[in-house]
Amino acid sequence: MPKMKSVKSAVKRFKVGKNKIKRGSAFRSHILTKKPAKRMRNLRTAKYVHSTNVKAVEKMLGI
């Protein structure tokens, strides 16, 4: 049986570390002038995928 292919868009969006999956923040692409600097600073930091979504992301990544 051939190897399962990973979803390429998921490979570009997620990074796998020690038992956790990192993701970038949303709401940073446009209409940024009305968003406060504090909010933009907080959105720059990477987040972890929520426990309810981990199984789906792992399936997409082929883990």
Curated annotation (Swiss-Prot):
Belongs to the bacterial ribosomal protein bL35 family. Pfam families: Ribosomal_L35p (PF01632). InterPro entries: Ribosomal_bL35, Ribosomal_bL35-like, Ribosomal_bL35_CS, Ribosomal_bL35_sf. It comes from the Bacteria. The lineage of its organism: Bacteria, Pseudomonadati, Campylobacterota, Epsilonproteobacteria, Campylobacterales. The gene is rpmI. This is Large ribosomal subunit protein bL35. GO terms for biological process: translation. One of its GO terms (cellular component) is cytosolic large ribosomal subunit. NCBIfam families: rpmI_bact. GO terms for molecular function: structural constituent of ribosome. Keywords: Ribonucleoprotein, Ribosomal protein.
